[in-house]
Amino acid sequence: MISEQVAATIKQRRLQLLVHSCVYYEFNQSIVDDATWAKWAVELEQLQAAYPAIADKVEWAAAFKDFDHSTGYNLPVRDPWIMRKARQIMIWHERMNNNDKM
């Protein structure tokens, strides 16, 4: 049970960091603030250090092999799936902002 929760959190944090790094580095936008991104990155780094056997089995393991929480610049943000998700989130974010203005 714990290993499933750890794996799910590692996957979630990896995807969040990948997508939001893509938004930032490829599209020159920011949806989450730096403090939130850093919190996710530190949590991921700690989980990967505490549970390396689980982390090695979770999606995107190779991309996060030597990850430290300092930057998302070297992550594979140009992956087509990541770029598509980043675009979807930017569209959703824009729609939410437009709805708030009404």
Q: Which ranges hold each PLM region?
A:
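Phosphate/adenylate-binding "loop-and-lid" substructures adjacent to NTP/NAD/dNTP-binding pockets
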Residues: M1-M102
